[in-house]
């Protein structure tokens, strides 16, 4: 079976949406929700605001209740019948995220074996045929075929095949099986 590795944040989990809601509700800002659809947080927020947001992300519980991306559960379930599915997610930047991320994955994707969940820093260690990720830096370091999942921070990137929804992922990977 071919190996398909999925990133968690902003691929399976709608982390960006949670961060935007925190900024709009808890920060002093003139920005609106539409601003965050066109540019990444690093482009829009002051460094002090980013630092504050990172502290919030490193709080136990932050990653526990993030919404699942629409269509992700159903599509990944179907894909698991044809591909060996792995999840590779970073947790070293936010060390308190490990338990929350693992519990989140077990809750929403119980059909992915715990042995196929990889917590890492640099995704160059991943040996897989495909990697779907929202960060180009992870795709650059990957030896297989990288596929960019659309997010506001990568809208200008053109070097990789792109998917924007889980329906796109389904069309790309399930039409050939």
At which residue positions do the language-model features occur?
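Active-site neighborhood of HAD-like aspartate-dependent phosphohydrolases
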Residues: 1-51
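Structural alpha-helical scaffold elements that stabilize or flank donor/cofactor-binding regions
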Residues: 4, 79, 124-125
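Short, acidic loop-to-helix structural element flanking the phosphoryl-transfer center
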Residues: 55-87, 94-99
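A structural signal for isolated positions on well-ordered beta-strands in alpha/beta enzyme cores
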Residues: 84-86, 130, 147
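Substrate-recognition "cap/lid" segment bordering the active-site pocket of phosphatases
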Residues: 88-141
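Acidic, Mg2+-coordinating phosphoryl-transfer loop and its flanking beta/alpha structural elements
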Residues: 132-167
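Short amphipathic alpha-helix with an adjacent loop that forms part of the alpha/beta core around
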Residues: 168-177
